[in-house]
Amino acid sequence: MTASAPAASTSARLLDGRRIAEELLDGLKSRVDARLAAGKARPGLAVVLVGGDPASSVYVRNKRRAAEKVGIEAFDYDLPQCTSEAELAALIDELNADPKIHGILIQLPLPGIPDANRLIQRIDPRKDVDGFHPQNVGHLALREFGLRPCTPRGIVTLLSHTDQPVRGRNATIVGVSNHVGRPMGLELLIAGCTVTSCHKFTPPDVLEASVRNADILVVAVGRPGLIPGEWVKPGAVVIDVGINRLDDGRLVGDVGFDAAAQRAAWITPVPGGVGPMTVATLMQNTIEAADAAGIEGAGVGIR
């Protein structure tokens, strides 16, 4: 039998991603300080931004600030929108060969390049701190430590800050993107959950039933209010990855927050939930890549 979640209180407790991310960053700064005190190189992160998309610029600025906070040296590559795939490939080759660079971040989406997979696969897997390279996703599928996709790994960290067990729970993931939904399923399988994944071909009645059965609900689609809060199981943990700007300027998630907060035990706010954890986890991956640099077979181990 699968353990059921406890009954909800009158309102959910917020999983404050900003606070938890700050705690993680403080610990990472201590790790960088210890590296430097031991005479090791400062971790280096190459941040590549193509074009001037406002949302991408905000994300990159947040990542650069986090790098500065923990003592990672950020190498900025702000490129014009007309940058070609061939030019990006040449830059990636250069960064792969640079010993000062331990992590490479290519901010997505890339204007004029509808399929970035070729470029992602060109990154040295040992420097793929986003965790998107097929080799790193493969390590995760084999239950091995490695550079894991940042958002799912950050969500696992969030779950560890609740008073609820993860093992033995029913988990439903809505959304099956390569960067969030699919690796999230792998993370929760490794954690001992029974995992259901829902997507655009899932019939509406099956989607509703899967959400109502979820002790842990992760929604990552990018459609405001896709999941009515009334569907949330009493006592569930709700992780809302979606961030959507409404016509009135408000930022909302994919889950109806007000109703969900009256049923869930824990829920992430939007904004301030998953986003800060993604950035902090990117820094975590960068430091781990620096620690593993030059050590054959480092950074991979059975979980």
Swiss-Prot record:
Molecular function in Gene Ontology: methenyltetrahydrofolate cyclohydrolase activity; methylenetetrahydrofolate dehydrogenase (NADP+) activity
Pathway linked to the protein: One-carbon metabolism; tetrahydrofolate interconversion
Superkingdom in the source lineage: Bacteria
Pfam families, per database record: THF_DHG_CYH (PF00763), THF_DHG_CYH_C (PF02882)
Assigned EC number: 1.5.1.5, 3.5.4.9
Function summary: Catalyzes the oxidation of 5,10-methylenetetrahydrofolate to 5,10-methenyltetrahydrofolate and then the hydrolysis of 5,10-methenyltetrahydrofolate to 10-formyltetrahydrofolate.
Protein name: Bifunctional protein FolD
Organism, as annotated: Xanthomonas oryzae pv. oryzae (strain KACC10331 / KXO85)
Classification lineage: Bacteria, Pseudomonadati, Pseudomonadota, Gammaproteobacteria, Lysobacterales
